[in-house]
Amino acid sequence: MKFTIIGKALVVSAAAASLAVGMTACGNDNTSGTASSSGSASAECGGKNALTAEGSTAQQNAIAEFNKAWGQACAGKNLSYNGTGSGAGRQQFIAKQVDFAGSDSALAKEQIEKAAERCGGNPAWNLPLVFGPVAMAYHLEGVSKLVVNADVLAKIFQGEIKKWNDPAIAALNAGTALPDTDIKPVYRSDSSGTTDNFQKYLAAAAPESWKKGAGSEFQGGAGEGAQKSAGVVQAVQATPGAIGYVEKSPAAAAGLPFAQIDNGSGAVELTDDNAKKAIAAAKFAKDGNDLALDLKSLYSTKEQGAYPLVLATYEIVCSKGYDADTAAAVKSFLKVAANQGQANLSKAGYIPLPDAFKARLLQSVDAIA
């Protein structure tokens, strides 16, 4: 089945930021409490008041919106989220130091058994809650519209295409006067889920050109490294001829232009609606309530008008194995996040969940015991 999935994968702040999640009420004997009148949907407010989570910084701002909504829908509820990175979040979840993890990637094969042990012998589930488009931000004087594709990007970030007027780029930009300027690729020098997803995109959409693999460390071997998203934005701003991959929100805030991406069916601008089209074409890796995505189906889509470079982030939870108070609170938070918590996501640079995907996500949330 295809589901439209979009939300922005961003970093979550700690307890200081009230993180709220809009969720639809879902009848469950283990979740008690009164529904709040605030928000667009009633909320189940059972379970303990304080939850802890850790992980992805890409979803952090979205988590802050969710926590704010949770506190409004369920008085006294609060999630303390520590944005230490996806790897640290998964480790802390497995070690039972937090109630759930935020992660830019689903659990790795070698982590699945350990996560099940943490969950009392029950599987941990990867629930994609936050989606954010990744922009190809650039700095090229006199060029207000630029089109690239996965093949061109793969060759740029490996140092094979070195000039902006290279014939491969010119072929995608008919009618545009491209300068004879050196291309300056900018990549994340720190371990990054954005890097991992960017390289997965290149591997899926340009397998003949990108053979460097994926992973949270940049493998291309060309360009200038910069720390975190803010560093990429600053480097692109300061460097004529630069191009870098970075989450849409910080790039837009800096006023940087974004390249359009030709997915094989024409050039596509980065908009919420165009990103949703790509997510609608994506598939889950397997059946059941573990909703890990088949990223190849997302990144290699040729759906007309679909912007394919989208970062998905997960909440990694126990399917069973929580005590009753924790299970009820986790479900409450996730339901609010999927409902009331969606209201301000677009302003924060994320893509609100489409109804069809939200309904599927809530089925899995409902099944947490």
Give, region by region, the residue ranges found by the protein language model.
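Sec-exported extracytoplasmic/periplasmic mature domains
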Residues: 64-76, 94-98, 106, 138-141, ...
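Extracytoplasmic ligand-binding site segments that recognize negatively charged/polar headgroups
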Residues: 133-137, 143-233
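N-terminal segment of the mature folded domain
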Residues: 33-170, 233-235, 249-254
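Bacterial signal peptide processing site
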Residues: 27-30
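Ligand-binding pocket segment of bilobal, Venus flytrap-like solute-binding proteins
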Residues: 90, 191-284
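Extracellular/periplasmic juxtamembrane helices and adjacent flexible linkers that interface
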Residues: 2-4, 11, 25, 43-46, ...
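Sec-dependent N-terminal signal peptides
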Residues: 7-17
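Bacterial Sec-type N-terminal signal peptides, specifically the leucine/valine-rich hydrophobic h-region
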Residues: 20-23
